[in-house]
Curated annotation (Swiss-Prot):
Serine protease inhibitor. Probably by inhibiting serine protease tyr-5 in males, prevents the maturation of spermatids into mature motile spermatozoa until their transfer into a hermaphrodite. Also required for efficient sperm transfer and thus for male fertility. InterPro entries: Ser_inhib-like_sf, SerProtInhib-TIL_Domain, TIL_dom. GO terms for biological process: spermatid development. This is Serine protease inhibitor swm-1. SUPFAM superfamilies: Serine protease inhibitors. The gene is swm-1. Disulfide bonds join C20-C53, C29-C48, C33-C44, C37-C73, C55-C67, C80-C114, C89-C109, C93-C105, C97-C133, C116-C127. Residues 20-73, 80-133 form the TIL domain. Changing C80Y: In me66; severe reduction in male fertility caused by a premature activation of spermatids and impaired sperm transfer into the hermaphrodite. Seminal fluid transfer and trans-activation of hermaphrodite sperm are normal. GO terms for molecular function: serine-type endopeptidase inhibitor activity. One of its GO terms (cellular component) is secretory vesicle. It holds the Pfam family TIL. Residues 1-16 form the signal peptide. Gene3D superfamilies: Laminin.
Length: 135
């Protein structure tokens, strides 16, 4: 009898319907590169986490785990990668190793984005110290 109760509990937990939070939807295969406040991970593993809640289209996940519109991202709810800083209005012409001082640039505001911190430049997916750029 005890084993039957345990098996019933295991089956109930395994087949339970997951409830998603506001602005989320249940997906059969979760994308581990889910867009977040400030950035979308570009280097991530390809794996499928089944029956998980993803942010609905048009929403991103903040550092508190909530799905919000990009306009709702703030410095406090955004966790930027190493050597990056949150900008409410970032540049469309971020400095890179190849172009450390971009001169020709359209005036665009990239809203609520993580970009390289002062003294760092973009090199591939990361921000590195200017002096560490390949020669």
């Amino acid at each position: 009898m005890r084993i039957l109760v345990i098996i019933t509990c295991i089956v109930a937990v395994a087949t339970a319907t997951k409830t998603c939070e506001a602005n989320e939807e249940l997906v059969s295969c979760h994308n581990t590169c889910e867009p977040q406040c400030g950035y979308t991970p570009k280097a991530c593993t390809e794996q499928c986490i089944m029956n998980t809640c993803d942010c609905k289209d048009g929403f991103v996940r903040n550092s508190l785990g909530k799905c919000v519109e990009v306009s709702e991202c703030t410095k406090e709810t955004t966790k930027c990668p190493e050597n990056e800083t949150f900008f409410g209005c970032g540049t469309a012409c971020e400095a890179t190793c190849e172009k450390p001082n971009p001169t020709v640039c359209t005036k665009q505001c990239i809203v609520n984005v993580c970009q390289c911190s002062k003294g760092f430049v973009r090199h591939g997916l990361r921000c590195i110290d200017k002096k560490d750029c390949p020669k």
